[in-house]
Amino acid sequence: MKGNSRHPSVPPPPLAPQSPTSKATAKYTNKDGSKFITVPKGSTPADSAQPSPTITTAANAAPGPQSASTSHTQGHGLGQAEGQVQPVNKKKAKRRQKAAAKAAATQGIANPAPSNGFPSPSPSHAQQSTEADHDDSHDEHLEEFNNRRDSRASNIHENGFAQGATTSSKKSKKKKKKSHAGQNAAELPNSPQHDTYVPAPQLSQHPRPGISKEKIWNTSSQEERERIKEFWLGLSETERKELVRVEKDAVLKKMKEQQKHTCSCTVCGRKRTAIEEELEGLYDAYYEELEQYANHPNQGEAPPMLGRRPSFGSMTGMRPRGLPTSYPSHHQPSHAQIVDHGAEEDDEEEEVEEEYSEDEQDEDDYSDDEPSEELHRSDYPADFFNFGNSLTVQGGILTVADDLLKNDGKKFIEMMEQLAERRMAREEDARDQFGSPFSHSAGDRNAHYHPPADDEVDDEEYDEDYDDDEEEEYDSQDEEETMTEEQRMEEGRRMFQIFAARMFEQRVLTAYREKVARERQNMLLEELADEKRRSEERLVKKQKEAQKKKERQARKKELQAEEKARREEEKMAEEKAKKAEEDRQKEQRRQKEEEKRKQKEAQKKAEEEERRRKEAERQRRNHEREENERKARELKEREKKAREEARLKEKEAREQKEREAKEQKERQERQERQEREKREREAKAKAEMEAAKAAKDKSKQEDRAAQKAAALATTAPVPITLPKRPAQPIQTSVPAAVPALPQQPAAYASPVIPVATPAFPKVPAPAQSRQIHQQESVTTSSGPTSQPGSAVSQNPSPHTLTPILTSPGPVKPPSKSGVAVSGTQNSGVQLPSPAPSTTVNAGSKPLQSQANPFGGPSMNMPFQPTPQPPPGFSNHMQPQYPPFYNPANSYNRVAPGMMAAPPGFSAPLGGRAMSMHSPGFPGPLDSPVSSFAGLPAGLSSLLGKDNVPSHTRQGSGSFEIGPVSSSSQPISRPTPIGRPASVVHGQRRSPEFSTNGTDQAEQEVHLGSSALLEPDDTQQDFPARSHFGLLGTSAPGVRSAPGFGGGPFGMETGFSLPHQNSPWNPVPPLQHNPFVPPPPGFPSSSHHGPWSQAAPPGIMGRNPSIVERSAPWSVTLRKSLCAVCEDLGAGGSSSYDGFIPLGEIMAHMKQFTVNEKEVLDICDTEGNPSNGGGSFIVRDPLSPSGSPLIRYVPDDDASRAPYGPIKHPGDIGSPIVGSGSFHVGS
């Protein structure tokens, strides 16, 4: 066949008899694990079968004399399994399984199998054997069909639904079809063994051992049927109607919905209408008959629809009554037992609800598949409540509606026709064999059936197998007469009624099972509570036992602990002793190491202390050395200051004494001078006439002398040594004034012009020799008065009527020590003319304008044009004026920015006012642009006796040149050579000294060379010279007049010669000219000029010997810082080992607008001779809020030696005075 061709199989051999010692059960579990099935391998006798919703066994009644058939035993076992629910405790389940296996083994020994190996049927199945003997030959095909269906269902349940029921059912079906004929042939000789009959009540005489006596858990099939009947009769009318009512409308509605998309032609519509009408008629007829039977359940005859109950061998595994009873042993269903894991009743309840949740579609599930067989109800035709063996509805089986939709109901009608014919034949045979339909019990109807799921039964294969069977059946029934149309319709109604009846049975069975499930659930809850209580009791008992056991163990442990503690104590004592010994040894080693460490530390500490002591001693020595040095330095400074103060005090005392002496002397001299002047005026009046004549002669001689001097201008000077003459007593009265000879320096030879000497009173010789001596010394004036009898009148008479007589004489050479003429002295004095016999009257009338023999302007008209100079002189004859000279106001004028000297005082060395002098003649030494210095003796005498020096000896190089007194002084006795008071260290001449005559008297006493001055004293004159070079080094008195070249005969003329130092000579091209170019008409010098880098002396008010270069601001600041640090360090202001706080330094540098950072930056500058030298040490402040500390370290003397001051004239190593032009003899 089609279905078997796809799954060929080999028929298995017959099973051997069960051994009593073999394992009696096999265990199966469903998919979800909620249930497991234990199936005994051997058959055991049972009282009866009960309906079960989960297990269905095939009733394969083999012929034999056994007291219980396989089907009967199976039904009993299943009923017992259904009623029994395993508790939660697994131990009880195992005990029950063992008891069931033991009972099965015992039953197998008591009822041994026949020699052919097939079990003998029970006596209650004798009717089945009898029916098998009367089966007709035309039923063989149906028997084969049913056997195949039975084998399929049996094989499904033997293997369990949870273990792949689909595959097992297919294989079993194929095995049945192939091996059925041979098996039947082999079993036919044993068929007479089934003829024995045993009444049904004997089934209850063999209760199953090990089963609980509670009937709710353990009931037989018969008892369950009785219970179902009692349940039905106990229901009310409404409950019965509710159970038996079939939802006709739901079925029709479902059919309409399924046919909605089918063909809508008229033919199909008529078919659908006919089917619907037929179904309605069938349902209505079924309701009427069911109601009649329900109202009369105990009638003798069963209703027409229940005359014969259909047998669903294809699904239940039960063999029809008319079939042979010889089946192979492997079709024999095993005794099965269901064990639920907690809620069997709930699963059954849910299963039943699911079965009826599809709007009564399940009613048709049995109309297509199940009517192929029928179950003979001859043994209980009137027992309606002996319901079909476990009608569990499952999905997936073809329903009536599906059949009607697929093949228009043709298959359904044909199936019902065939079944009707076979049923009728079997019923007739059964009536013929058994007289009464109630003579047999339903012991063989106890098998339960569980329809397979959708995936376990292949509907297509089922239909194919069914079609093949039908073909074979139709082939074997060709000779049978066909039924009429009315019979087919009647048979269809009966088959539908059978289907509806079975559905009714299913509903009643479901309701009953729901009730039983509830009862079992309650009982289970009670058992669970009991089990829980017993468990709690057992738990308490166990706890008590455990407690006792713990106590025993505790006592035992205590003993062991005591023993162990004792051993531990002994062991610890030993270890303690051992450890004490080790500790003692370790302590000894530690003490030794500690002693060594202490010794090392002591040694190290001693070394450290020694090092610290040495370091402290070294620091102390350094500190002491520094302190000693500082103290020595301070002591030296203090001694130096003390010496200076003592020297100053001595000088002040001496000066005070000298001033007092000079004042006394001046008073005396003033009185004497007044008397002398009176006598001189008288003498001058007498000699006025001779003086005029003498002057005329002298003028002629001077002209000749000037020509001769011009011729001798180029001759080299010859050093002349003049002997000194002792001073003579001063004559107090002179009969007549004799013109004084012109004063000449000792280094020049003066031409002597012989002139006629008038008859004048003879001048004493000492006075003449003294005049020669005065040319070699610095003159001083003791007062304005002159002594009578003096040969030289040095000041004009205060009386205006006194004439001044001049005599011709040689031209006066330039004077090295001129007189600074102040404004008060020169007021009212006119320049006299050198003409002979000229009388100057200062009070009555001005002098007459006379021609200047040297081409200069006249004396009373100094600004007239001058004639050409004599031969041999420079051609620069025009007046050469300095840049700041104003010829209109020449007297007592100073350059812009220069300070003029007060009246009666000589201008200081560096800032003398410019005085008018004759062009071509240099000024005096102390006034570089002075007037009247260098005039001829006659003109000099006209200026007054105060302007003529009485002592003209030049100092030997001192920078301090005192002003010349305006009055003639008597020559006193020479004193030993000593240090002049004017050059005392650190002293300057004050203006008051020049007025009261103290300096004059001092210079009279202190004559001689300045070479005896101390070198260190001379170095203090100009402190700046220690760091700056001087621009000029020529000594005063021997230098040329500034701006004017030297004239012939060693004279300093105002006429510029080539290569002479003149401020109006051309400026050298390489020199920087910081000033404006010279004005037009002023010649330039090839050397130094006023617009060169070195300003001319007198122009800027500075002596060329001490003019300094302009220094940068940083150099000035550093020099000031050096001076401040030296002053503070010398004064003991530093209290930090020579370091001075920056705050104190800033307090002494207020004249500079600098901050601390600039001062600190200046401290980092390297010292050199130009910025102060030395170096600075800066230390961090001692406290965060303090200021840095600065210490100035000056350079040593060796480093300063090359930059020392230039020696003064007369010092050892000083430059040669006059650049070797002359030598002054002593």
Swiss-Prot record:
InterPro entries noted in UniProt: Fungal_stress_NST1, NST1
Location of the region described as Disordered in the Swiss-Prot/TrEMBL record: 1-225, 294-388, 423-491, 526-727, 757-876, 944-1001
Coiled-coil region(s): 517-708
Signal sequence coordinates: none
Biased composition (Basic and acidic residues): 131-152, 211-225, 423-432, 442-453, 530-548, 556-706
Polar residues: bias regions: 45-59, 113-130, 326-335, 791-805, 822-852
Gene Ontology CC entries for this record: cytoplasm
Biased composition (Low complexity): 707-716, 777-790
Compositionally biased spans, kind Acidic residues: 343-372, 454-484
Domain of life of the source: Eukaryota
Key words, A-Z: Coiled coil, Cytoplasm, Stress response
Composition bias, Basic residues: 89-99, 170-180
Subcellular localization, as worded in the UniProt entry: Cytoplasm
PANTHER family for the chain: LD36051P (PTHR31780:SF10), STRESS RESPONSE PROTEIN NST1-RELATED (PTHR31780)
Chain's role: May act as a negative regulator of salt tolerance.
UniProt family annotation: Belongs to the NST1 family.
Descriptive protein name: Stress response protein nst1
Gene that produces this protein: nst1
